[in-house]
Amino acid sequence: MSVTTVLFDLDGTLLPLNQDEFVIQYFKHLAAYLAPHGYDPELFTKAIYAGVRAMTENDGRDYNEAVFWEEFSHFFPQAREEMHLFDDFYANHFSKLQAFCSCNPRMRALIDRVKESGRTVVLATNPVFPATATEQRIRWAGLVPEDF
């Protein structure tokens, strides 16, 4: 049996970081950004963890994103109407979290070698992050989303 597909983990493998510290900083930065818009930071943190828990318990009945927002909206019913705030955070502020990561330039060469061997390259990552955050973290690793 030959290997046809190689799965790479993003956080901690392709993108070196302390995942626990990164998640703490991520939630802290997002909560601080949203606080002036009526999102109490303490309640916000509880809402995030409740949404993440709902995703981990998702039995496939719906997409993780839908499951997250359904749970999060119990805490902040206005959140779905204020998605522009979240979009702005990811477009203009999420990049500050790159300071909590490093880059291993050998990963670029490794991905290239695997692809040149004819194997399919697949990315695995934490479902906590929306697509835009995942794409940014891929770039922080010195890669591009099209690599996967």
Model feature map: region roles:
Residues 39, 78, 143-144:
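Helix N-cap/coil-helix junction residues
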Residues 24, 28, 66, 131-136:
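Short, surface-exposed alpha-helical segments at coil->helix boundaries
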Residues 14-16, 97-101, 107, 139-148:
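A generic "structured core" feature
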